[in-house]
Amino acid sequence: MIGNRLCAFALLSASAIIISAQPASAAKFDGTWSMTAVTTRGHCGTIPIGMGVAGGRIYSTGGSFAFYSISLGGRVSNSGSVSLKAVAGPRVAHGTGRFSRVRGSGTWKGRGPSGLCSGVWSATRS
């Protein structure tokens, strides 16, 4: 019984360390970025967004859409693969793409004030 508890504790401790440890290579994308989302389908326009990356996590540093502040969230993998979510009031968009050391690009889709929109995004390190 004690052996099972000790084994379970060791497994949980190791899992917590693995989950919380951020690989050093993900830090190569850390910093501030200037992002632009361009609509290619629908009526959402061109949207400039301030973006930051810390430890592989994406967050917003500025920008608005339809009079709402934009909140960004998402991840950048060690290889530069990006998945992100943007929320501006009741509007939500999801995007995917890829980062290199100084720029990134991808696609997005979501809902604007007048219906569904989709397009491309690009980002450069500030």
Protein language model regions, located:
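Central antiparallel beta-sheet cores of small beta-barrel/beta-sandwich binding domains
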Residues: 27-126
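Sec/Tat signal peptide C-region and signal peptidase I cleavage site
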Residues: 19-26
